[in-house]
């Protein structure tokens, strides 16, 4: 790669490393509708199986409605003593990713692709986020008056991060559970690249 390409890759690599699941935010930092629409614009340009584009979105930056969405989510299963962020550290906005059964009954991995893309976009904006699949779907559908043909797939919580997150190499015990130290630094164990590659067929 030429130097400019190397620099671009290094920048992208840095954004990916920063794009951790952030669960504590500065709730005083407001996120407006325009910002959320920009993220939906990124999702619009993502790949979609058979180009069906079956995903729809609900955006929320209203404080009262955000509080209701918050109560529909399961926060950090491995941190059993932690019930989620206190009010001043809650997300400032949410994006709900929905599968539209009027378009297709198969959503494949489209929602994962768009969720990751929007979270990367949020990091470029200086924001952080967390992707939720632990959702009380019945409660969320009632809270947001979601039509029957729309199926909640993921919820993105967004805000200005106040959490320090550190990537660690998985220890000899093989424990993959994230944890927090006495300084509230959030540690995320990751497998080494060598463990991930199970076959190599390269001659250069």
Question: PLM features: residue spans?
Answer:
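Acidic, surface-exposed loops and disordered segments
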Residues: 1-204
